């Protein structure tokens, strides 16, 4: 597995924060690094396989990656990321107690993926741009300024996370997308889902199309197909079983949609003919 080292990304040995844009981020094989990072998805879509579990990421997704986590990117489509790298929560010169603002693992579950709405994403970009402008300066005031900006970033993300901000339709749509990530195999009635998340059906369609570039049903189908592709690569279950587990009631229909989406059949993927990056 590829290991990325801090010496290749941080501007100096005492720098606590570094900015690494990926505009765009291409498919990248599984790797880990000797530093932590906050991945901010600017726009586009892709699959982020995090410790073996696939997540669909779109504009507004924020991923918290620790130094022992392994992850990869696949099926990227104009996926643009900004990575905010930091050595460790306890390796800051002027800050302490940062762990309290970061996601915490509880009973083996780590909430690695958050979502923020468009207005918050704009504020995030401004903070990151300020950090980036100061990267070449190593005097104490500049170091303190970068660390303060990093603290502001964590506070903004914390306050704006789904757990704490559901007061507008953009935030409710983000919650709906997170719900689909966990319930993709269920039979989805869009009228009921819209009501569940206090959205009109028209607003749901419009905002989901704006955020993902896809209609709701197209987004759900792609999500199911991507989950199925992951299982084809990483499990021994039969194609039929995987189709059912991913919400398809007809394995033949599943195979047709799968080939249309990926230009490979499920059997091709199972046999590794697509040259997937391991």
Swiss-Prot record:
Domain HTH araC/xylS-type: 174-272
Example of a GO biological process term: rhamnose metabolic process
Database matches in CDD domains: cupin_RhaR_RhaS-like_N (cd06977)
Lineage: superkingdom: Bacteria
SMART domains for the chain: HTH_ARAC (SM00342)
Keyword Transcription regulation: yes
Residue range(s) of DNA binding per entry: 191-212, 239-262
UniProt main location, coarse: cytoplasm
Site (Interaction with sigma-70): 241, 250
NCBIfam families: PRK13503.1 (NF010028)
Record function comment: Activates expression of the rhaBAD and rhaT operons.
Name the record gives this protein: HTH-type transcriptional activator RhaS
Upper lineage: Bacteria, Pseudomonadati, Pseudomonadota, Gammaproteobacteria, Enterobacterales
Gene: rhaS
